[in-house]
């Protein structure tokens, strides 16, 4: 009996020691966000909340190492390389362009990403089995392009010409433009491409839109436009140009309309992928998930500044109306 109790005591002590050892070796998660610390705080909080819900707590069993590109797209590769060399066990990254940079920097470290369209961006070839070292949460953004055309047409029934502002060097832009053109054709709307690759081109794009007599502009998301969303909104109002965006943050900054997934929710959702990687699953075997919540947001203050009356039917359907 005494011998049995001794064996049990030794086992308990060993397990306690093992647990302490596991807790002392926190998983190092490199976090790469293409915006600034201030502009990224909401999404980082979503990620942290998702991790905490799963029992992964900063300073206890995980260690977050944060890196920001501050909206400078030319820094993406250098920051990605720095993070890949930092000794991180996992890299979490937000945005298609930043994810592409991390993918170029390492094919060994597991990557959990939140992206607009991982397929169109060439990050993976299959959502169910991503392969390689990437998994995470992604939209199929081209599918949402048609919905945005539908929404802005409902907001402006007389709309007959529209601009699509995008960065043609981004791989996924071609598919989104194609889907926007296809949807616009169904509404007898002609489409004009507007190139916006850096902040200095925003003014020119809206000047061109106004001179061409466009009735509105679809802004295709990328990290540059997201970081400069307040400038986009202000410039659009100054040129009296209605706009629609992918995410509500643009509308919070003064844009007119948005339809797309909730970004904070996507970051929170991605925590499940991080936990699976920590438990030993290969990222390439973890299916990429799609967002579960989409929202229509309308800024009536901006509509008033544009002299636009948004139809009550659209306002009724909105998830949020900013007044």
Identify what each model region corresponds to.
Residues 1-323:
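Short hydrophobic alpha-helices and adjacent helix-cap/hinge residues
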């Amino acid at each position: 009996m005494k011998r049995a109790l001794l064996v049990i005591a030794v086992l308990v002590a060993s397990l306690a020691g093992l647990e302490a050892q596991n807790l002392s070796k926190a998983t190092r998660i490199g976090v790469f966000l293409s915006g600034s610390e201030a502009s990224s705080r909401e999404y980082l909080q979503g990620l942290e909340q998702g991790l905490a819900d799963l029992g992964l707590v900063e300073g206890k069993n995980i260690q977050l190492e944060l890196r920001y590109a501050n909206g400078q797209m030319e820094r993406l590769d250098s920051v990605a390389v720095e993070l890949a060399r930092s000794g991180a066990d996992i890299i979490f990254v937000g945005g298609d362009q930043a994810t592409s940079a991390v993918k170029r920097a390492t094919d060994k470290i597991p990557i959990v990403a939140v992206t607009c369209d991982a397929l169109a961006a060439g990050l993976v070839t299959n959502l169910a089995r991503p392969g390689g070292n990437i998994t995470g949460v992604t939209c199929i953004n081209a599918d949402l392009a048609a919905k945005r055309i539908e929404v802005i047409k409902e907001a402006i029934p007389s709309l007959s010409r529209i601009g699509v502002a995008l960065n043609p060097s981004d791989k996924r832009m071609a598919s989104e433009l194609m889907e926007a053109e296809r949807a616009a054709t169904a509404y007898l709307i002609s489409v004009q491409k507007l190139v916006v690759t850096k902040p200095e081109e925003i003014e020119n794009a809206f000047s061109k839109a106004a001179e061409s007599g466009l009735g509105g502009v679809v802004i295709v998301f990328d990290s540059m436009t997201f970081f400069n969303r307040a400038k986009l909104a202000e410039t659009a109002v100054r040129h009296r140009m209605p706009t629609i965006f992918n995410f509500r943050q643009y509308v919070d900054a003064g844009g007119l309309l948005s339809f797309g997934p909730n970004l904070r929710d996507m970051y929170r959702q991605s925590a499940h992928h991080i936990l699976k990687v920590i438990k030993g699953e290969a990222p390439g075997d973890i299916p990429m998930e799609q967002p579960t919540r989409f929202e229509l947001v309308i800024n009536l203050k901006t509509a008033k500044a544009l002299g636009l009356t948004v139809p009550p039917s659209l306002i009724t359907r909105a998830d949020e109306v900013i007044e």
